[in-house]
Amino acid sequence: MTRRYWNIDLEEMIGAGVSFGHGTRKWNPKMAPYISVKHKGIHFTNLTKTARFLSEACDLVFYAASRGKQFLIVDTKNKAADSAAWAAIKARCHCVNKKWPGGMLTNWSTTETRLHKLRDLIMEQKAGRLNRLKKKDEAAVKRQLARLQTYLGGIKYMTRLPDIVIIVDQHEEYKALHECITIGIPTIGLIDTNCDPDLADISIPANDDAISSIRLILNKLVFAICEGRSGYIIKNI
């Protein structure tokens, strides 16, 4: 796989607070190779390594997108959920930014059934058929639709398992990460100083709490996916 240039700037990462880690008491010793300094009780990640692994991740998603592969972005933290949704829309990816539905990937047949139901209900609503139901039945169906939309709305067009999953917070999204590991889906993950760098296929040392840091990392990945997709579209015209 040929390496490409993704305009990853250390000063930009410093400004976004990418290097800020957790307090030294909360660290994972496995993160030692990715930490550059300890200052006032806080660990700071080595941004040179962040740039290296972010570049590798961009290369991976670029080449995957250029071959028509599908991506899933997972970030269910309230403060970062909007960033994940924006990234998914921009890159035309699938997204889970509410509570992770247990077994979503490992029990894919059940998820498929629920997605079919969601799409059917959306079509029924658009056609105005829900309004023809009795009030009680209409209310029950609308509650079901709202629930499905909340938890599966970001993947409603997903017709198969994703090829690559991008996980923004290892601790918050451990269930999703574990499902990916179980069925062998490659993962890209942001890892703060309290994370395990060995779990994801590509781990990007970065602050996974600050919105500015999350957006910067996602922006780079989204740009790489979009670049890859444009090449795929041109090849298939």
Curated annotation (Swiss-Prot):
Protein species of origin: Epifagus virginiana
CC annotations in GO: mitochondrial small ribosomal subunit; plastid
First and last residue of the signal peptide: none
Keywords noted in UniProt: Plastid, Ribonucleoprotein, Ribosomal protein
Family label: Belongs to the universal ribosomal protein uS2 family.
Gene: rps2
SUPFAM superfamilies assigned to the protein according to its UniProt record, in alphabetical order: Ribosomal protein S2 (SSF52313)
Protein name: Small ribosomal subunit protein uS2c
Database matches in HAMAP family: Ribosomal_uS2_B
